[in-house]
């Protein structure tokens, strides 16, 4: 696996509150290797060891870079309010699929059902764009518009997804535990933020970090998005090189 330098600094992580964890009473003992000893708690909360965070975040960046260079597809999941906007922006910048409103149970494990819903969603979007809904009786048009609105909310971020994702990035494993369990069941690799109350053994690769702070979530996503974009550029460059070689 290609290893690169991702410019992850302690000052930036401190400024983004990446190190701030939960109340010491809420911690998961499995997180002990990733947090500072009890004597270094701040106002009754655990503090994440940022040296550990930097190591795992750098590893995650290496992983997504290499995956993107192989043209793998990513799904970013973050349905908590504090994460929704950052997830949307990150997905747009990295050209990834995303879920930032509500995770529908079985979205991945019942993929055939999800595909059916996606086909209906795309069909309704086409009809609306072409003005076909306006030609229908008001009652019928209103029903279809409500259906379209519901599908947009639940499936809008995956409307172009034609197969199961190769990697899933999860912001809060407790909030989106159902999504994580579906990935585990299907064997889809996962990268997850883990706060001091999380289980570090669930995701394929865990990044110890504050998953309740907008600034922390944004910081982690920015690093991962940059790595994904760099990987995609690498893929394009390699593709162009192969074409030039075939020309000679």
Swiss-Prot record:
Query: Cross-referenced InterPro entries, in alphabetical order?
Result: Ribosomal_uS2 (IPR001865), Ribosomal_uS2_bac/mit/plastid (IPR005706), Ribosomal_uS2_CS (IPR018130), Ribosomal_uS2_flav_dom_sf (IPR023591)
- Major location category of this protein: plastid
List the Gene Ontology MF annotations in alphabetical order: structural constituent of ribosome
What PROSITE patterns does UniProt report for this protein, alphabetically? RIBOSOMAL_S2_1 (PS00962), RIBOSOMAL_S2_2 (PS00963)
**TM segment ranges:** none
The organism's superkingdom is given as: Eukaryota
Location comes to: Plastid, Chloroplast
Q: Which GO terms describe its biological process?
A: translation
Q: Which NCBIfam families match?
A: rpsB_bact
The entry's family comment says: Belongs to the universal ribosomal protein uS2 family.
* Name used for this protein in its record: Small ribosomal subunit protein uS2c
Q: Which organism is it from?
A: Trachelium caeruleum
